[in-house]
Design a protein with these regions (language model features):
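RNase H-like nuclease fold core
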Residues: 2-52, 58-66, 135, 139, ...
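RNase H catalytic domain
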Residues: 11-21, 55-132, 136, 141, ...
Length: 158
């Protein structure tokens, strides 16, 4: 990455059925450069893919202490972080059967190393980066050699 500590991330997740095959798409932008990421899974949910997009973006970083703005069309992800839902879920041990604990804990670990701010964007609207992430996510969901979403399939989460 460049010497700039500013990073912009666009994310999207998709599933063909809920549950069904799914995928995520990510665009990272820094210092006039960009990188795209995507992956597909054979059985998952849209919320898991929305969150997995954020995790994949953060896992791709090789520096800590970055100022990151993440643009997402997922109110589930944006509100969980911005409105304190995640903090409450962690404090209560995800009581009441809150879903996606495995992914939320991965996100939480990664976010501790960065300065992350979320911005909600309307999906399938006039944001070209969100639209590109949607193409990446749906193409990945429709692809071959889909990965196993271990936290979903192996834990019987629905």
């Amino acid at each position: 990455m460049s010497t700039s500590k500013e990073l912009i991330i666009y994310t999207d997740g998709a599933s063909r059925g809920n549950p069904g095959p799914g995928g995520y798409g990510v665009i990272l932008q820094w210092g006039g450069r960009s990188k795209e990421l995507s992956a597909g899974y054979r059985r998952t949910t849209n919320n898991r893919m929305e969150l997995m997009a954020v995790i994949a973006a953060l896992e791709a970083l090789n520096r800590e202490g970055l100022n990151i703005t993440i643009y997402s069309d997922s109110q589930y992800v944006v509100k969980a972080v911005s409105e304190g839902w995640l903090r409450k879920w962690i404090m209560t041990g995800f009581a009441g059967g809150k879903k996606n604990k495995d992914l939320w804990m991965r996100y939480h670990q990664l976010a501790q190393k960065q300065k992350v701010k979320f911005v909600w964007v309307r999906g399938h609207a006039d944001n070209p980066m969100n639209n590109r992430c949607d193409v990446l996510a749906t193409t990945a969901a429709d692809g071959r050699n889909l990965q196993v979403d271990e936290g979903f399939e192996n834990n019987g989460e629905v």
